[in-house]
């Protein structure tokens, strides 16, 4: 199908065309860049909220995502879910599965669910995910939920493409909180302790709040025995932090919420907090700041992808690379020597 025809079908709201467009972007088929360039004109026009949902396996992210979908649909919002499963670089096997637990919401015409496994897509998984999110936003979705299967660097890069990142933990995560702290904990705007009816939930909440207090330069945050403070509660009130109220308007203090997704507990508060964070991003100007940073990073990623493809499309350069890889493996050449030789071949034909 020609790109112009596909764009026309998307304009008409054809769901089948949406699926084809996403496949085109995922697999970088001919015309995908033209498609994205045209759809880019519609990105940022409507108040779409991109929400990243990440956390260790077994935290109940899919169930939590399903509950969010239900809550948003009750408000009449169109919801898309991108379930990101990075592919094993060794076997090429993806951990996909069709998210069977979401079958009940997938039948809703106002819901679109897509599992992604890119098998080493050029330009990186995060770039591809963001491009797919652009297609969904241009199609008219109000909420785009980006769910990852774990907390590795790839998943964190994907989650970082969202405007709001939710880190989902379970009471059993408490033992590993110190290791999580180094990378995962820093990316979240909102922490959710799911399965909070299990022992250890309150203790984990306290540990997270103490960690957040230390990060903000206040090691003596008040710890509350209820279902997690809101951003407003934690930044205001006597004795609850010593921050300038004026400065608080331009900053967001990540709340810790408690949920039991299988029972729907805490979902209303989670939805309200997500809305509040999006409002904060808009009113503070940080949404535009993030958008500009993301677009700058994306432009560089797209340029890198184009350069890489340009090099590999040069048949002689590709043949030279294939021959020199044996030399690298044998230890007679270094990767740097070979890269320089291939680039010289592309530039000068020598």
Task: Map each language-model feature to its residues.
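Nucleotide-state-sensitive switch-loop elements of NTP-binding domains
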Residues: 2-59, 65-154, 161-176
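Glycine/charge-rich, flexible interdomain linkers and switch-proximal surface loops
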Residues: 36-57, 65, 87, 153, ...
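Alpha-helical scaffold elements adjacent to nucleotide-binding pockets in ATP/GTP-utilizing enzyme cores
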Residues: 95, 131-132, 157, 161, ...
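Short beta-strand/turn micro-motifs at beta-sheet edges
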Residues: 100-101, 176-181, 241-247
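Flexible active-site lid/hinge loop adjacent to a nucleotide/diphosphate
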Residues: 171-199
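Canonical P-loop GTPase G-domain recognition
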Residues: 190-279
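Short, basic, low-complexity termini and linkers enriched in Ser/Thr/Gly/Pro
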Residues: 242-243, 348-350
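Long, well-ordered amphipathic alpha-helical subdomains in the mid-to-C-terminal portions
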Residues: 250, 257-261, 265-347
């Amino acid at each position: 199908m020609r790109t112009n025809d596909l764009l026309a079908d998307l304009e008409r709201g054809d769901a089948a065309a949406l699926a084809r467009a996403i496949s085109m972007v995922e697999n970088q088929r001919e015309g995908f860049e033209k498609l994205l360039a045209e759809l880019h004109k519609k990105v940022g026009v409507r108040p779409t909220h991109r929400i990243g949902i990440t956390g260790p396996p077994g935290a109940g992210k899919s169930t939590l995502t399903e509950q969010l979908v239900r809550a948003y649909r009750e408000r009449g919002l169109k919801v898309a879910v991108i379930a990101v499963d990075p592919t094993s670089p060794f076997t090429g096997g993806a951990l996909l599965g069709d998210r069977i637990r979401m079958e009940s919401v997938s039948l809703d015409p106002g819901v679109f669910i897509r599992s992604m496994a890119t098998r080493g897509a050029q330009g990186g998984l995060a770039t591809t995910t963001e491009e797919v999110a652009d297609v969904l936003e241009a199609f008219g979705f109000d909420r785009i939920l980006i769910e990852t299967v774990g907390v590795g660097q790839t998943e964190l890069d994907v989650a970082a493409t969202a405007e709001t990142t939710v880190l989902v933990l379970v009471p059993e995560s408490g033992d590993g909180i110190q290791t999580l702290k180094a990378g995962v904990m820093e990316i979240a705007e909102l922490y959710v302790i799911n399965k909070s009816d299990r022992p250890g939930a309150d203790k984990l909440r306290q540990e997270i709040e103490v960690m957040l207090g230390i990060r903000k330069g206040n090691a003596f945050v008040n710890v509350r025995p209820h279902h997690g403070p809101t951003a407003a509660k934690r930044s205001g009130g006597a004795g609850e932090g010593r921050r300038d109220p004026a400065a608080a308007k331009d900053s967001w203090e990540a709340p810790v919420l408690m949920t039991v997704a299988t029972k729907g507990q805490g979902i209303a508060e989670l939805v309200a907090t997500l809305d509040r964070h999006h409002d904060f991003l808009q009113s503070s100007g940080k949404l535009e700041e993030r958008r500009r940073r993301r677009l700058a990073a994306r432009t560089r990623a797209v340029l890198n992808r184009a350069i890489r493809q340009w090099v590999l499309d040069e048949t002689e350069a590709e043949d030279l690379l294939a021959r020199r890889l044996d030399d690298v493996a044998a230890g007679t050449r270094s990767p740097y020597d070979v890269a320089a030789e291939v680039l010289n071949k592309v530039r000068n034909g020598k």
